[in-house]
Amino acid sequence: MSTRFPINSTFLESIDKLETGVVWVLKNLPDDAFFTVGQIATDWDGDPKAYGDRRKHPTIAPHDHLGNAGHHGHWWGVVTNTRESSGTPIEQSGKGPDQPYEHYMISATKLVDQRFKENDVRRWTDATTVPYVALPNSRRSMIKIGLKTGCYCLMVNLQSMMYCFGIYADSKAKRGRMGEISKRAVDMLGNQDGSILIVVFPASGQGKGTIPDEQTIQSK
């Protein structure tokens, strides 16, 4: 069961309201950070074994439901042969570091490593190795104060009070929800069930073309 956490808004200003709650900034430091509370949910995007067609390949065991990546004629979460959502998902060859897992699709994320091509799994932010947060797409309130892909964030499990730092590496379509975090972040926070405090630091990070490793992220 999730718990609602009261917030004293004396020194805070609301900049947005999502399905999961209000987004706040400090009144005296409105551009330094924003925060909100959401429900913890696991994001597998970027994981080389996140998605695959089990009807076509019964021996594979994808970590996430294929429907979370799209459907025939409209794929938003995996790389296709045409690089368009209407294309056919590329299946890994199982050969080499670029496509190591045969028959699995190539799961995409918002944050990329520009050194690698789109059909290379190393281009995408792996949910199993990088602690990251997924934010709602195109929220003007967040963009206005400097939110960019790759920004650093702090995540706190409000049940266990365990915390970790992460990056903004994925986006969640049109739904105004917070709390979806990478599998690695879930593991670091120690509990998948409950509420999470997410503090995002706009205009931080290394930018859209670089994926920092976990050690770099936790040193911030």
Question: Predicted segments — roles?
Answer:
Residues 1-162, 166, 175-176, 189-190, ...:
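Cell wall/extracellular polymer interaction/catalysis modules
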Residues 174-184:
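Short, solvent-exposed secondary-structure boundary/capping segments
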Residues 192-194:
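Short helix-terminating capping/connector loops at secondary-structure junctions
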